[in-house]
From Swiss-Prot:
It comes from Acinetobacter baumannii (strain SDF). GO terms for biological process: amino acid biosynthetic process; aromatic amino acid family biosynthetic process; chorismate biosynthetic process; shikimate metabolic process. Keywords: Amino-acid biosynthesis, Aromatic amino acid biosynthesis, NADP, Oxidoreductase. This is Shikimate dehydrogenase (NADP(+)). GO terms for molecular function: NADP binding; shikimate 3-dehydrogenase (NADP+) activity. Belongs to the shikimate dehydrogenase family. The gene is aroE. Homodimer. The lineage of its organism: Bacteria, Pseudomonadati, Pseudomonadota, Gammaproteobacteria, Moraxellales.
């Protein structure tokens, strides 16, 4: 019997999840159908519950419903609890289970690039939900110190305070985007600057070996500046594929290889 999956969001037409999951299915021999599902901004819960009531096997959640999905789950993975957001849902024994595969997707993408994560010092630009979701997996993968830089320093400080309890083994620090300096192994752009076109200026006194842009398929002043410095760089398509592979393997018990889809 064909398993039914969906990705839910608003907007949703831009999602590439169906093509990815159908490609994984073809490679692994899983019989599935994966659809986009547009939910009204005030209708996430009813749309999600009706999908599972109709026999849906699993659902991915995208903007702006990840926090709502988190709040509705009966059972959460550790990384979802720390992220306080869920992008992967499934029903088990009548209970709604939730996970967050974004951070693992980023780690898989960085490892596929053969950038070392062990004992690294990482700078993340932005202190929103995207940043919260990747800290724990980065630390698990070996990152030694993570500095979070944000326009509003208080927001970065709040995030560090929240995460210090959840990820006590990590060295976490908050700084203002106006105070960017020092040496880092990897800089990750998790701000919406690349999405909105706001130019983010990286000062000369900020040094880094690699640059990763979480967004993909759009112009990025962050990546332009990495290119000018002749620093190896990548954009977020690998992260998208990586998080999709993680969700696919949770649902179907088989893991496609990331390198086959990059």
């Amino acid at each position: 019997m064909t398993k039914q999956f969906a990705v839910i969001g608003n907007p949703i037409e831009q999602s590439r999840s169906p093509e990815l999951h159908h490609a994984f299915a073809e490679k692994t021999g899983v019989d599935l159908n994966y659809q986009k599902r547009l939910a009204p901004l005030d209708g996430f819960e009813s749309s999600m519950r009706s999908f599972f009531a109709e026999g849906g096997s699993g659902m991915n959640v995208t903007v702006p419903f990840k926090e709502q999905a988190f709040a509705l789950c009966n059972v959460l993975t550790e990384r979802a609890q720390i992220a306080k957001a869920v992008n992967t849902l499934w029903m088990e024994n009548g209970k709604l289970h939730g996970d967050n595969t974004d951070g693992q997707g980023l780690v898989a993408a960085i490892q596929a690039l053969e950038w070392n994560l062990e004992n690294t010092t990482i700078l993340i630009l932005g202190a929103g939900g995207a940043t919260r979701g990747v800290i724990y997996p980065l630390v698990q993968a070996g990152a030694k110190k993570i500095v979070i830089a944000n326009r509003t320093l208080a927001r970065a400080e709040q995030l560090v305070d929240d995460l210090k309890t959840a990820v006590p083994q990590a060295q976490l620090q908050a700084i203002s985007l106006n105070d960017l300096e020092g040496d880092f192994d990897i800089v990750i752009n998790a701000t919406s600057a690349s999405l909105s076109g706001d130019a983010l200026q990286l000062p000369e006194k900020l040094k880094f070996k690699y640059a990763y842009e979480m967004a993909y398929g759009k112009p990025s002043s962050f990546l332009d500046q990495a290119k000018q410095r002749n620093v190896p760089y990548a954009e977020g398509f690998g992260m998208l594929v990586g998080q999709a592979i993680e969700a696919f393997s949770i649902w179907n018990g088989v893991r496609p290889q990331l390198k086959d889809f990059l």
